[in-house]
């Protein structure tokens, strides 16, 4: 597997820490560890008492239990913790797709959403966001993109880079669409809070 160079990361490597004004990053405003711990009284004791060894491969049980509370109908044993989006995308493609498969990816988008699959030999079709529609993608176009080889639909909500966020109704229709066509749905929700509270 030979992925294409990650253009955004190459750009950041050159400019992220030297630009006078950085307007192209999605990082939140940073804070110190003491500022973070101040959100929960007594948490410094918990941090200082934390064990730094290996944990179970799906992630620390306490973390998985806490993550499960964020989603309706998801048990903690159905959660696998990753170190970031790159690892999760790679794991999904490696485990769920084969070189003869086809994936539909909401575009424009985060490069890894399509380039990792392409590096594995998966054929990728763009499901294009339309500026004139507020960056929503056309549902009829999605239907037309499905082939007998299609195995996955990849979306990002809120969408990167446009910021489009589907209504609950639209999101539910996308969720229902995937199993109706025998597809895995990979929904990258790296930016769900606070903007996605309505879902």
Spans of model-derived segments:
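Active-site phosphate-binding strand-loop segment of PLP-dependent enzymes
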Residues: 131-197
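A short helix-loop-beta submotif of the ANL/AMP-binding
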Residues: 118-124
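N-terminal small-domain helix-loop-helix segment of the aminotransferase-like
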Residues: 1-84, 91
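A short helix->loop->beta-strand "cap" motif at the edges of active sites that frequently abuts
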Residues: 101, 122, 180-183
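Aromatic/hydrophobic pocket-lining residues that form π-stacking "cages" and hydrophobic walls in ligand
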Residues: 91, 113, 174
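Conserved PLP-anchoring active-site segment centered on the Schiff-base-forming lysine
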Residues: 95-117
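Short acidic capping loops at alpha-helix termini that bridge into adjacent secondary structure
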Residues: 75-79, 100-102, 149
